[in-house]
A protein has these predicted regions:
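Short, well-ordered amphipathic alpha-helical segments that serve as non-catalytic structural scaffolds
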Residues: 149-152, 190-194
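Structured mid-domain segments that build the active-site/substrate or prosthetic-cofactor binding neighborhood
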Residues: 193-198, 213, 222-232, 247-260
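Extended amphipathic alpha-helical segments enriched in small hydrophobics
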Residues: 180-192
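Non-transmembrane, aqueous-exposed alpha-helical and coiled segments at domain scale
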Residues: 211, 234-237
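Structural motif corresponding to the C-terminal cap of alpha-helices
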Residues: 154-157, 195, 199
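Short, hydrophobic/aliphatic alpha-helical segments
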Residues: 237-247
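Catalytic alpha/beta active-site cores
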Residues: 1-176, 180, 206-209, 217, ...
Length: 260
């Protein structure tokens, strides 16, 4: 899809009340002109912007976005969004490794250092949900996935608080209404315990830091939820509507940050 058409669609749904946008940018089209056309008339300070591209070009995308935001004179500390870099999902879905996770993650964190509210390390547990996993399997693997980011990057010398604040979880939502509510609430509690085990030190003067200077902000899980495609049928759109509505309501009641 050309950037002009994507921009027009984005502006249309923004006018209808949406406050979070997601864009997929093809690696071969990745340049400053493309980004400018794609984000024309979209105020990056007023809406959450989420981007994905080929895993080998995420650092280039981050650099282009920072340059664009600086050119537009935005306050970079206020911008919210994400860049979908997920080293493990590629192996899970395709059985292939793509580059070195630690070096790419370090470069990505450096490129987005001026964007403190941008999450750039993703846990795409949605893949498991759409493959038919049970709720406990999706939750367990997602937490292990996030812990692996923490483990490898802190071993590489990065502060635990910085790494934790850059991780975003993308969960699927099944039609098991009450258990889905429980899943999201349990995920937040368990992730907070995992992050706390790394003793994240508060990197700035913050009202929310603990009595031993631990960073409580780092323990907050950022969740995007997406309704499942695993249980949809080709033969009855009305059944699909009911299932999707049930899934969306359970995620909303559980307090996810954004939803598709």
């Amino acid at each position: 899809e050309c950037p002009k058409e994507a921009n027009a669609k984005a502006l249309d749904i923004l006018n209808k009340g949406v406050d979070s946008l997601s864009f997929h940018v093809k690696a071969k089209e990745l340049n400053a002109e493309y980004i400018e056309t794609l984000l024309k008339d979209i105020c990056a300070e007023c809406v959450e912007l989420n981007f994905s591209t080929c895993q080998g070009h995420v650092v280039e995308l981050a650099e282009l976005l920072v340059a664009y935001f600086q050119k537009k004179d935005y306050d970079l500390t206020k911008l919210r969004g994400s860049i979908n870099y997920d080293y493990f999902n590629k192996m899970l879905a395709k059985g292939k490794e793509k580059g070195d996770m630690v070096s790419t993650a370090k470069a990505l964190l450096e490129a987005t250092a001026s964007l403190p509210k941008y999450r750039v390390l993703n846990v795409n547990a949605l893949t498991l949900n759409n493959a038919g996993s049970y709720i406990f399997q999706e939750l367990g693997y997602a937490l292990a996935w996030g812990n692996e980011y923490m483990n490898q990057l802190t071993d590489a010398g990065l502060p635990a608080a910085l790494v934790a604040k850059k991780i975003k979880f993308n969960f699927g939502i099944s039609s098991n209404y009450f258990l889905e509510i429980a899943k999201f609430r349990a995920a937040r509690m368990l992730w907070a315990n995992i992050v706390a085990s790394y003793n994240p030190e508060c990197l700035r003067d913050c009202e929310n830091k603990g009595e031993h200077n631990e960073c409580r902000c780092a323990a907050k899980m950022r969740i995007h939820a997406e309704t499942s495609t695993f249980n949809l049928t080709l033969f009855d759109a009305h059944v699909n509507l009911l299932r999707t509505q049930t899934e969306a309501m359970s995620a909303a009641l559980a307090g996810v940050d954004s939803m598709t």
